[in-house]
C-alpha cells in the first residue's frame, strides 16, 4: 500500500489526545487517521515505566498492524517511558507532544509557565 493511502496513528492513554487529533484533522484534511485511547488502563501516571512501556508498545503495535504510516504519541507519560523503544522498533516517524515544553521553558518572555505532569513524566530524564 502506498504510504499516501495509509493513516497516521494517534495514541493516548485516554481521550485527551482527541483534542490534538481534532487540530491534525483541520491542518491535514487530506490525511486519514486512526486513534487509540487506552481507556481500559488509564491513568498511566502512577504505573511503573515498565508497565507504561508495555502498554504503550501493545497499543502502538495495533496501530502499526492497521497500517499507520506514522505515530503521534499524545501522552507525555507514554513518551517518557517508551519513545526510544518505539523509534527503534518501528520503521516510521514516531513523534510526541512532549518536546513543546522545552522551547517554552527556554523562552525569553517574562512570566511563568505551568507544566502539568504525572509522577512518571516528572521522574523521567526527558
Region roles according to the model:
Residues 1-126:
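Non-catalytic structural scaffold of enzyme domains
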